[in-house]
Swiss-Prot record:
InterPro entries, per database record: Aldolase_TIM (IPR013785), RibuloseP-bd_barrel (IPR011060), Trp_synthase_alpha_AS (IPR018204), Trp_synthase_suA (IPR002028)
Function: The alpha subunit is responsible for the aldol cleavage of indoleglycerol phosphate to indole and glyceraldehyde 3-phosphate.
Top-rank EC class of the record's enzyme: lyase
Official protein name in the record: Tryptophan synthase alpha chain
Entry coiled-coil feature ranges: none
Keyword Disulfide bond: no
Protein family according to the UniProt entry: Belongs to the TrpA family.
Keyword Lyase (UniProt): yes
Enzyme Commission number: 4.2.1.20
Length: 268
């Protein structure tokens, strides 16, 4: 059984949804980044969604772009990211760990080589933000070869054919966008998404996690009430890092408290 399947079964039995924080690995530097991941787990994160820093993150707003810049300026490489992931995996053998990244990072290797290294580091899933569903075949083939779940985005304006394709190709979970555009806590998630959730379930998609603009417990609660399996929050988490760069201990405590608050909102 995959770690995602086990997680969703456990949460359903406990009448809870999932809360999944996102950060960019290496932000603000590799050593602190590892402490940040530990702080998120301490707060009760059900899974992790982690970015590998990239110089041109087109799907991201300024907050996560700045996180990638800080990570790159601290000389974070894909190899360093995999080292950090390996250590986190060794300490937390049951925690689902997903990567959210851009195709160029895969192409600096071959898809097969990248997914082989990801598997060795303990990665469960990969979402490639800038690859459309219809162009994802070589990536999915490499992911399947190494037993890594392929995550696909269900956009808010998707028609039934798109949702059927997403449902057919996805494994692990479905990333449901609350709104169009780039990432960012400044632009709130737009509810309702009930019709998309109903269609995804009808088409047999894996559980949906709602992302983009999730920054408050009320939004997590609304997502789960609408039928999502949980919520992903990125920019709101990264803002805590950004606003506390000169006070690392305060930053870690605020991150843990934020996750606790968001996780508490997942109780059904």
């Amino acid at each position: 059984m995959s770690r995602y399947t086990a997680l969703f079964e456990h949460l359903n039995a406990a009448n809870q949804g999932a809360f999944v924080p996102f950060i960019t690995i290496g932000d603000p530097n590799p050593a602190q980044s590892e402490q940040i991941i530990e702080a998120l787990i301490a707060g009760g994160a059900d899974a992790l969604e982690l970015g590998i820093p990239f110089s041109d993150p087109v799907a991201d707003g300024p907050t996560i772009q700045d996180a990638a810049t800080r990570a790159l300026n601290s000389h974070t490489t894909t190899a360093i990211c995999f080292d950090i992931l390996s250590r986190i995996r060794a300490k937390y053998p049951d925690l689902p760990i997903g990567l959210l990244l851009y195709a160029n990072l895969v192409y600096t290797h071959t898809p097969e080589d990248f997914f082989k290294k990801a598997k060795a580091a303990g990665v469960d899933s990969v979402l490639i933000a800038d690859v459309p569903v219809e162009m994802s075949v070589p990536f999915k083939a490499a992911a399947d070869q190494f037993g890594i779940e392929s995550i696909y985005i269900a956009p808010p304006n998707a028609d039934d054919e798109t949702l059927k394709t997403v449902a057919r190709l996805s494994s692990g979970y479905t990333y449901l966008l609350s709104r169009a555009g780039v990432t960012g806590a400044e632009t709130r998630a737009q509810m309702p998404v009930d019709h998309l959730l109903t269609a995804l379930k009808e088409f047999g998609a894996p559980p949906a996690l709602l992302g983009f603009g999730i920054s408050e417990p009320e939004q997590v609660k609304a997502a789960i009430t609408a039928g999502a399996a949980g919520a992903i929050s990125g920019s709101a988490v990264v803002k805590i890092i950004e606003h506390n760069l000169n006070e690392p201990a305060v930053m870690l405590d605020k991150l843990t408290q934020f996750v606790k608050k968001m996780k508490a909102a997942t109780l059904r």
